[in-house]
Amino acid sequence: MLKSAKLYIPSIAAIILSSNIAMAXNNYDTGHATPLRQVADLIDNQITNIDNLFKNRLPLYESNSIKSNFITKDKQYIIIMEVPGFDKSQIKIKVNGNKLFITRNIEEKNKADDSDNYMNKNFNYVISLYEDVDQANISSSLKNGILTIILPRIEIKEQDAREITIN
């Protein structure tokens, strides 16, 4: 029985804390923080600290991802990607079936120190191509950190449709 009571105490405290948060806020606005409000602030600070720990450690949470734009025009599609610091020998563009693959898979050793630290600047984009893309005439260019891929469009003849009767 004592073990089950220990399990319920944190749950009960959380319920009391959440149900009385408005009451604690009233005194907090006047500059007189209640013990309940102090506990709520402590919990908020700890959650913020945990969020900051992961945000600073995982670049996934940062806005370091490659920015891209897809533009549709009458005669072509245009893909524009920001890839600052890359040169054309580091980026590979391939077409396979109806997929366009844009990749960079190179590890760079950190030259600033003698440790075995590597910087990973890899990326891998797979784009499904529309059926009206002229795959034989896709072109690309890289200038000032901007990768531009031109996907020419061809006219697709509509196949003769046949109506199916419902029995």
From Swiss-Prot:
sHSP domain mapped to chain residues: 59-167
Decide whether keyword Membrane is in the record: no
Q: What taxonomic ancestry is recorded?
A: Bacteria, Pseudomonadati, Pseudomonadota, Alphaproteobacteria, Rickettsiales
Output this protein's name: Small heat shock protein C1
SUPFAM superfamilies in alphabetical order: HSP20-like chaperones
Looking up Gene3D superfamilies in the UniProt record yields:
2.60.40.790
Q: Could you confirm whether the keyword Membrane appears in this record? A: no
Family the UniProt entry places it in:
Belongs to the small heat shock protein (HSP20) family.
Family annotation (InterPro entries): A-crystallin/Hsp20_dom (IPR002068), HSP20-like_chaperone (IPR008978)
Tell me the keywords, alphabetical order. Stress response
Q: Which organism is it from?
A: Rickettsia felis (strain ATCC VR-1525 / URRWXCal2) (Rickettsia azadi)
